[in-house]
């Protein structure tokens, strides 16, 4: 069918099976083949890739390939080779789409987790479609930032696809999104980079309403937020409180109240990242009160740096 009908293709030629693969069994219609010959060929190919190119990261767009015997053999070889390269320190990262229990980094496509994970994990998603198409709609910079913050607050990492034209260029809308993310990161990056999840990931309506399921597991990664929705990260003696939408009034963060069992330390200072304005605040019995700043940035997610007394 089509303009390629009748054109010879060497992938269909049995003489070239070593370059491609053998003829598929009509009953073998799963995402991963059951053919043991091809499984061993795959393992040999990935082993060669690891040995020759020593990748920092490997990603499988599926669960653990071909079950425990093949998949775990590949991971063990990958990790062992990486430790030889790094004087006994494991720095390699392997992603695949199933729960890992720390054996590798779980990937959730177009979704997120609904709570803090003991083990690092990853969301992979796109600002639009996976590939370019004329007239497609993109996420806004604010939506990407909200998604990033929610993921990081739960011990996750965001792998973001940025759509390019067939020529490898970026459309003006895409450039604007990246510039918006860059502006926010310049002001608030310290609350993301090198941070860890706090004792809870957040508070507000988004933590109590029923979660919408994601496309490939987990919960939906892009969702609406209000100013009362808060996310947390921590670093040293500091907690960062992300207000997930533009504050319209004073903030009351109940997780940081005087009597909160979550935080037993007294607060020394509160500031807003990216601003020199002196923030008015008070740690009350029922909540940490933060008076709405007189000047707010152009982006939606505002970050407050809360330093505890030592």
Task: Give short role names for the model-derived ranges.
Residues 1-310:
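Mature catalytic domains of secreted/periplasmic carbohydrate-active enzymes
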């Amino acid at each position: 069918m089509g303009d390629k009908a009748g054109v010879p293709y060497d992938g269909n030629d049995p003489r070239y099976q070593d370059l491609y693969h053998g003829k598929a069994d009509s009953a073998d219609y799963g995402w991963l083949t059951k053919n043991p010959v091809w499984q061993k060929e795959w393992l040999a190919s990935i082993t060669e890739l690891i040995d020759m190119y020593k990748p920092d990261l490997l990603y499988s767009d599926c669960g653990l390939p071909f079950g425990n015997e093949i998949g775990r053999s590949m991971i063990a070889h990958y990790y062992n080779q990486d430790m030889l390269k790094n004087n006994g320190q494991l720095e390699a990262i392997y992603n695949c789409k199933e729960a890992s229990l720390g054996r590798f980094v779980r990937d959730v496509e177009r979704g997120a987790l609904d709570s803090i994970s003991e083990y690092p994990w990853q969301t992979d998603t796109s600002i639009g479609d996976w590939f370019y198409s004329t007239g497609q709609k993109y996420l806004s910079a604010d939506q990407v930032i909200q998604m990033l913050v929610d993921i990081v607050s739960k011990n996750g990492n965001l792998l973001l696809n940025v759509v390019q034209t067939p020529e490898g260029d970026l459309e003006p809308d895409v450039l604007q999104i990246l510039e918006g993310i860059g502006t926010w990161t310049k002001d608030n990056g310290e609350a993301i980079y090198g941070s860890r999840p706090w004792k809870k990931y957040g508070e507000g309506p988004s933590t109590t309403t029923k979660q919408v399921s994601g496309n490939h597991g987990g919960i939906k990664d892009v969702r609406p937020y209000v100013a009362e929705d808060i996310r947390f990260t921590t670093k040293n003696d500091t907690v960062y409180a992300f207000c997930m939408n533009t504050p319209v009034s004073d903030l009351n963060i109940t997780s940081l109240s005087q009597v909160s069992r979550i935080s037993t330390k007294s607060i020394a200072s509160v500031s807003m990242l990216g601003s020199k304005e002196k923030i008015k605040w008070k740690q009350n019995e029922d909540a940490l009160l933060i008076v709405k700043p007189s000047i707010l940035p152009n982006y939606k997610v505002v970050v407050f740096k809360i330093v505890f007394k030592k």
